[in-house]
Amino acid sequence: MADVEYRCFVGGLRWATDDQSLQNAFSKYGDVIDSKIITDRETGRSRGFGFVTFASDEAMRQAIEAMNGQDLDGRNITVNEAQSRRSDGGGGFGGGGGGYGGQRREGGGGGYGGGGGGYGGGRSGGGGGYGSRDGGGGGYGGGGGGYGGSRGGSGGGNWRE
């Protein structure tokens, strides 16, 4: 049987909110296995969202119901069930297959958003996205081409040759 995770997404967080304060806020709804604020890998600063993993589905659902739209550290937060970490790509602003601006060359990927990433980027596999470093599909600043990307990756070519 596959491991089941009862994880919720928490958005709209203050940059000052840390893993411990996130856990403290959600632990009243059930057993919290993990709490994680997502940070920018270059600056180390919070990206304004995180995840809380519960021991049970019931605890996760109670937390979502109770905390969505509530104040945490002076900000109204958004809480919903996290999407599973599958590698089937697509999604985001602009969606898969070109994204904002479409493909820039005959190769797959290019454009702002890239194929499979979209604005904000996909985290698994081809695509990249605006500023994404994960995946290799291009996009603005993406991992395999695109403006600011690496030369010669699997993607839509570089903005400048």
Curated annotation (Swiss-Prot):
InterPro entries: Nucleotide-bd_a/b_plait_sf, RBD_domain_sf, RRM2_NsCP33-like, RRM_dom, SLIRP/GR-RBP-like. Residues 72-161 are annotated as: Disordered. The modification Phosphoserine is found at S87. Coiled coil: none annotated. GO terms for molecular function: RNA binding; single-stranded DNA binding. GO terms for biological process: mRNA processing; response to abscisic acid; response to cold. Residues 89-161 have a biased composition (Gly residues). Induction: Induced by low temperature stress or foliar application of the phytohormone abscisic acid (ABA). SMART domains: RRM (SM00360). Keywords: DNA-binding, mRNA processing, Phosphoprotein, RNA-binding, Stress response, Transcription. It holds the Pfam family RRM_1. Residues 6-84 form the RRM domain. Gene3D superfamilies: 3.30.70.330. It comes from the Eukaryota. Binds single-stranded DNA and homoribopolymers of guanine, uracil and adenine, but not cytosine. Also binds RNA, with a preference for RNA containing a high proportion of adenine within an open loop structure. Possibly has a role in RNA transcription or processing during stress. This is Glycine-rich RNA-binding protein blt801. It comes from Hordeum vulgare (Barley).
